[in-house]
Amino acid sequence: MLVVLLGPSCSGKSTFQKELVENEGYHAVRTATTRPKRVGEDLSSYYFLKDQSFAEWEVRGDLLCVETFRGWRYGVPRDEITRRGGRPNRVVILTPGGVMELLSRHPDIITADALSILYLGVDGATGEARACKRGDSRREYLRRMAADSIDFRHYPRENCVWEFTPDYILDCINNPQNYKLKPRLKRVERKRK
């Protein structure tokens, strides 16, 4: 099974991914980026590549769902997302654009696997508290919210038309341990296709 997590900044995607890895035996799909490692960031969270290496991976077709954000490039290594090995269940964090690319341009990955798309939502107060806790400045949090308002303009709100339908929409739950994946997934709302 391939689980795709998406949601705005500070919605708990990384925390939920960590829970799936540690408690459910999932493999965390490691993405590639040209941005530098943040202070205190674990080297295993990304493949940190120089611009030239990233471009070479992209030209070879080794990267999927490539996007640019604030001048830094991000992509998903094909072998990471298709890896099955000893941990057949994988979890990846994608942007809405990444999900659209996965659905429209990579049917080989989708048909070879069960695919679940989970949208994690967050309210403003909780998101801001989480950003502060992880050391983001208020300015950085507001910048992220502005970017999210563009990236997620088609996502959960009343009478919304979705570009794609997530399998589950999880409301903001302050305790990430309340998030569980199938069959123990807390099913908050199911959107009909």
Regions found by a protein language model. Give the residues of each.
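P-loop (Walker A) phosphate-binding loop of NTP-binding proteins
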Residues: 8
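ATP-binding Walker
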Residues: 11
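Walker A/P-loop
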Residues: 14
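Conserved phosphate-donor/acceptor-positioning beta-strand/loop module used by diverse small-molecule
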Residues: 89-96, 109-132
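Post-Walker A helix-loop "phosphate-sensing" segment adjacent to the P-loop in P-loop NTPases
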Residues: 22-30
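Small-molecule kinase domains that catalyze NTP-dependent phosphoryl transfer to phosphate-bearing small molecules
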Residues: 132-193
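ATP-dependent small-molecule kinase phosphotransfer cores
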Residues: 33-90, 94-98
